[in-house]
């Protein structure tokens, strides 16, 4: 089974991917189109034209796992402008899964402690 704690690299295929593709075809997209390879530390995410569903491909050591998520409300904030494989950090992956943009324009800035006296 998939253990997200073991996943170190979250990759998203920017732009559109045909979600009719299965395990073998998506693995071919990863290796041939993007020149990457599947391993136990990497999870690859794909999104079609309808941004309410995504597929994820993961190699678990003895076989592939294909995950499919369809939102009942809302849409994923998926980057569309580039046809590339982009590496996400765990926080950006979490934002994406929560429906937020992976590139937040604003955030609470870190501050310095102030003297109270």
Feature names for model-found ranges:
Residues 1-117:
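Polybasic/polar functional segments that serve as interface/processing modules
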């Amino acid at each position: 089974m998939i253990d997200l704690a073991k996943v170190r690299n979250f990759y998203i295929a920017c732009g559109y991917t045909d979600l009719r593709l299965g395990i073998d075809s998506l693995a071919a997209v990863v290796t041939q189109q993007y020149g990457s390879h599947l391993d136990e530390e990497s999870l690859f995410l794909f999104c079609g034209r309808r941004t309410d569903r995504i597929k994820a491909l993961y190699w678990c050591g003895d076989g592939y796992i294909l995950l499919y998520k369809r939102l009942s409300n809302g849409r994923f904030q998926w980057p569309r402008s580039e046809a590339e494989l982009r590496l996400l950090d765990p926080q950006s992956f979490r934002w994406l899964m929560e429906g937020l943009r992976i590139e937040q324009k604003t955030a609470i800035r870190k501050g310095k402690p102030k003297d109270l006296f």
